[in-house]
Amino acid sequence: MFIKNDHAGDRKRLEDWRIKGYDPLTPPDLLQHEFPISAKGEENIIKARDSVCDILNGKDDRLVIVIGPCSLHDPKAAYDYADRLAKISEKLSKDLLIIMRAYLEKPRTTVGWKGLINDPDMNNSFQINKGLRISREMFIKLVEKLPIAGEMLDTISPQFLSDCFSLGAIGARTTESQLHRELASGLSFPIGFKNGTDGGLQVAIDAMRAAAHEHYFLSVTKPGVTAIVGTEGNKDTFLILRGGKNGTNFDKESVQNTKKQLEKAGLTDDSQKRIMIDCSHGNSNKDFKNQPKVAKCIYDQLTEGENSLCGVMIESNINEGRQDIPKEGGREGLKYGCSVTDACIGWESTEQVLELLAEGVRNRRKALKK
C-alpha cells in the first residue's frame, strides 16, 4: 500500500519535498516467522560458519570456495544450480568448503537493475516487500542443500536474511563506508572486505581493523523499531583481492605484498589464512572467460605451498555469459540459468575449476609436509 506524499515538489517544505511517498515495510521478525529455517538448514549454516572460522585461523587446511551466479533472479534456476553444486561439494569436501554465492542486490556505478529484493518482477515496479518474501523463501530452501554467502549492501535487509548466511562480503564500493564497517562488527558470521575499486588494500585493512572493535550505531530491530545497537566486534574477517583500475592482484607477488601488509597491521600471522582471491571483476579484466586462468594461477601458488590463502570467489552459472533484461515484459523471455548482471562461467567450466582447486589444496598439503 503506497502512501502518497501530497507535499512532493513543494520547495517551501523543510523536508521530504523530494519524497514521492512511502510503502510500509514488513517487520523482519514477521517474515522470519513465516519462513523459518529448518533444523537441517540451521545445522548446515552453523557448521559452515565454524568451518570458515577454523580455516581463517589455520585449524582447517581446506580452501573456502564462494561460487555461484553474480546475482540470483530466478529461484527455480537457483535450486537447480544448488543441486548441482551440492553434489560436487560432497565429492570435494575433504579439500574444499564450497559455499554458494547467493547475492540478491547489485551495487551500481550508475543505474540498472538493482536485484531481486529491489525489483523482483524486473519491470521497475519495485515491489520490495515481495522481493524480501521471495528471497527469504528461496534462502530457507537453499540452506537445506548447502551453505550460502551474501553481500551486505545496506544495514536493514540483513535483519530479514542474515540468519541464512554462513559467510558475508562487503564490496569494493562500500568497504570504506563507516556504516558497513559498523554492520560487520555485529554480524554472526565471518565477513570479507574487498580492496578498493582502485586496487588499493588500505581501505580493506582499515575496515578489518574497524570491524574487530565494538560499535554503537542506529539500526532497526527484528520488530521493525529503530534502536541504538551495540556490537561486540567481529575478528573473523579476511581481505578479498578483486583487482582494480590499476590492474590485477591475484599473482604471487600481489599475494605476498598483501600478506606483509596484513601482518604489519596485526591482522594475521603465520598460522592464519586471511586472503581470498576473487577470480572475477578487476582480476578477470571483466571477461568471464579469464576466471579459469586466474584459478590456474591460484592453483600454482597452492602447489608451491602458499599458506596465506583462505579462499577463492568465482562467478558461475548453469549457462555461461550474460543477457540483458528485455525492455518490455520483465523476466519473460530470459534464457534459463544465465546471468542478467555480470557474465559468469558455465557449469562445465565450473566443475573443471573446482577439481583444479581441490587438487591445488592437496598439493599444498604435500608441499607443507616437506
Swiss-Prot record:
GO terms for molecular function: 3-deoxy-7-phosphoheptulonate synthase activity. It comes from the Eukaryota. It holds the Pfam family DAHP_synth_1. Gene3D superfamilies: Aldolase class I (3.20.20.70). The keyword Transmembrane helix does not apply. Keywords: Amino-acid biosynthesis, Aromatic amino acid biosynthesis, Stress response, Transferase. GO terms for cellular component: cytoplasm; mitochondrion; nucleus. Belongs to the class-I DAHP synthase family. Stereospecific condensation of phosphoenolpyruvate (PEP) and D-erythrose-4-phosphate (E4P) giving rise to 3-deoxy-D-arabino-heptulosonate-7-phosphate (DAHP). Present with 8970 molecules/cell in log phase SD medium. This is Phospho-2-dehydro-3-deoxyheptonate aldolase, phenylalanine-inhibited. It comes from Saccharomyces cerevisiae (strain ATCC 204508 / S288c) (Baker's yeast). The gene is ARO3.
